[in-house]
Amino acid sequence: MYFLRLIEFLHYLCTMERILMLFFSIFITLDTFAQYYPECEDTCSHIHGIDISHYQGDVFWEKVGENAKMAYVYMKATEGATNIDAKYQHNIDMAHRNGLKVGSYHFYRPLIPQEVQLQNFMAQCRPVDQDLLPMVDVEVKNGMETEAFCDSLFKFLDLMEKAYKQKPLIYTGANFYDRYLLGKLHDYKVMIAQYTEREPILKDDLDFVLWQYTAKGRINGIKGYVDKSRFMGNHKLREIRFRHK
């Protein structure tokens, strides 16, 4: 009876070992797949980058910095009058430590006084910390008439230019541009968002510098989705470098 129980026990141990080995193999396989995502930058020669905010959670910047195909990162700093992205200061510090070219952006709220919004942005974004032009995220007009909205926006852009001694980069969607900003941004460098396989073509054929082509990109070091963008045509990273006097 003793030997039968011993044999049963040994059989049980062998079974558990096989189960554990199977589980371990599955875990390794899943982890391997989780670390590799065939993406647009794997199949083309354009210069690519990412846009992040606190929505990406904790970013493993060492992993992001190891990706030689990611040349730049824009990170949200502020929104409106008082909103400050909770991850901004940590993100910009860690991105610099890991060798990335960094720019900061402000989400523009047209109904809020421009001077107050600029103060919010400047309190977070020191020129010395910036590698790339400050960017203004223009996505909403909050029910304003188009003319009043544009007056509001360009007042803010002028204030931003005076504060940082260079014109900011403008981010907006292709449809938003065609409806409200058509023909008005030829003096600015522009990033256009359009999540399609084909490159955007704007109604006035604006020669925009950057294209944000997906909100569902993947990259090692960031859990979940991340916005990805790339330079258009022959445009280069030097065009959006922050000029330090």
Task: List PLM regions with ranges.
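Boundary/entry segment of secreted carbohydrate-active catalytic domains
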Residues: Q35-E79
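Functionally critical loop-and-helix segments that line ligand-binding/catalytic clefts
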Residues: Y37-G49, L185-K245
